[in-house]
Amino acid sequence: MPVTRRRLLLVVPAALALPTLAPAAALRVPPLALQSWRLPNGLQVYALPDAAAATVSVQVWYRVGAKDDPPGRSGFAHLFEHLMYKGTRHMPAETIDRLTEDVGGQNNAFTVDDVTVYHSEVPANHLEPLLWAEAERMAHLEVDQASLDSERHVVVEEYRERVLADPYGRFFEALPALAFDVHPYRRGVIGRIDDLRAATLDDVRAFHRTYYRPDNAALIVAGGFDVADLARWVQRHFGPVEAPGTPIPRVAVVEPPRRRDEARRLAAPHVPLPAVALVWRAPGAAHRDAAALQVASALLAGGHSSRLHAALVRERHLANAVGFGADLRADAGTLAGWAIAAGGVPPARLLGVLAAETLRLAEKPPSAAELAKVRAQLTTAALVERETPAGRAEALGWALVLRGDAHAADRALDELQAVTAADVQRVAREHLLRARRVALTYVQGAPG
């Protein structure tokens, strides 16, 4: 199960270089056809019925992610995601695969800082068995030492492949730690090898007991089903799952303000060309500036016509690749711009131009054409997501996790379309120009 990074540097889809259209009236997007209720044990249920759909998407969103890793156990939430595919008291290992793949469906999972999500898509007439399986692993997961050792090995190899073997793996892994000094967002989702090796079966059982409970989960079902049938099946399978009487631990770290700009240097083996980055701390996804920051990010690096790509790659030939991301999570966020140098370009020069072009957004707001194009990119991406039951369910899930409100998925589209050039300039001044930043230079050398 891959670590899905709806996170740093991937938030704004750089491939969405859509043609500029003539200005048009704001789109009127129908709201999600949502029904919701809560079981007595605390499970939140969200139904998105679609009579025209032949499939259903079943998603369980647990409010536990990498920020909740126990002390000395970085990467544990992601490791646990893998373990959830092992057996339960009444369900052999790989049953989820049989219930999905054997009927032409699919399943997967992902872990990020704020949440762990298990999602499956099957033909609509196979919905109830999948609900039973999700309730079963919520209530009765059983993991033995062999399963823990096997999945730990898988995750360690994933870390080696994604971070150690990739020439720029250490570079991208370092960026969250530059934004935060004390908040657990500074840790990577995959964790550290030593911490993964230290995990025990007692850790597994305690983690499941603490976080994998109905009052810490949202069940989202979208597609072709009758809501009355869904309600009956959910009550049948999830209703008996007991919620512990203990409180759920929550991260309550207050990040101290950054007083000055900083510069860091990181060396790693097998780095073909230097890379540089600028990282700022940012507000969380529920902040009033979130939509304008998304637009600003897309203006800077949302495709080949974006400002950073035009200035650093196409016109000056200083970089082979550039990016900028607004990673706005539940508690706080990061803004990060990066560039990989073209051959012979000194990192210091590249860093200076990256900073100048990024901060130019605070002095030169977007033109009407720039703004219309970027709003079209972002709105189109959101509308494409809503074309499938799984996409609608995921949009709702992110609204719950990041903003605490399922209906925020609809408001987000209106907020994007309402962003003005003045809004973009204002947030660039507040969150980039006037904010403290950390500059990173990444070069070939022995790791420090």
Model-derived features: positions:
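M16/insulysin-pitrilysin zinc metalloprotease superfamily fold
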Residues: 86-90, 121-152, 303-304, 327-385
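Non-catalytic beta-strand/loop surface segments
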Residues: 23-66, 90-126, 162-216, 240-287, ...
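Short pre-active-site segment immediately N-terminal to the catalytic Zn-binding motif
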Residues: 66-72
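Active-site SXXK
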Residues: 74-88
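N-terminal secretory signal peptides and thylakoid transit peptides that target proteins
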Residues: 1-15
